[in-house]
Amino acid sequence: MSDQATTLKIKPLGDRILVKREEEASTARGGIILPDTAKKKQDRAEVLALGTGKKDDKGQQLPFEVQVGNIVLIDKYSGQELTVEGEEYVIVQMSEVIAVLQ
């Protein structure tokens, strides 16, 4: 787990992943304020912690396709949002991760 997730003592279960969304600019370069509908449909987020993982039909542990510290792309409305000590986090399932950004 990352230092931030350890400090908060948040441990996702199963194939869930704890992420923190990156802040999206609410104004365009020219200073125009963007409404929510004009913003992207996906969010970039940093992976902070991984759950215990998922098992296949034979009981074998399946590896996660992401690692702590990866920057991933998730749907804007996916996951379960939670606020801890004034910081916003999201717990998503592995299947909700669209891509790992390189």
Swiss-Prot record:
Keyword Chaperone part of the UniProt annotation: yes
Subunit structure: Heptamer of 7 subunits arranged in a ring. Interacts with the chaperonin GroEL.
Protein's UniProt name: Co-chaperonin GroES
The family this protein is said to belong to: Belongs to the GroES chaperonin family.
SMART domains: Cpn10
Main location: cytoplasm
Species in which this protein is naturally found: Chlamydia trachomatis serovar D (strain ATCC VR-885 / DSM 19411 / UW-3/Cx)
Localization of this protein: Cytoplasm
Domain of life: Bacteria
GO terms for cellular component: cytoplasm
UniProt KW keywords: Chaperone, Cytoplasm, Stress response
Lineage: Bacteria, Pseudomonadati, Chlamydiota, Chlamydiia, Chlamydiales
The gene coding this protein: groES
An example Gene Ontology biological process: chaperone cofactor-dependent protein refolding
Alphabetized GO MF terms: ATP binding; metal ion binding; protein folding chaperone; protein-folding chaperone binding; unfolded protein binding
Function: Together with the chaperonin GroEL, plays an essential role in assisting protein folding. The GroEL-GroES system forms a nano-cage that allows encapsulation of the non-native substrate proteins and provides a physical environment optimized to promote and accelerate protein folding. GroES binds to the apical surface of the GroEL ring, thereby capping the opening of the GroEL channel.
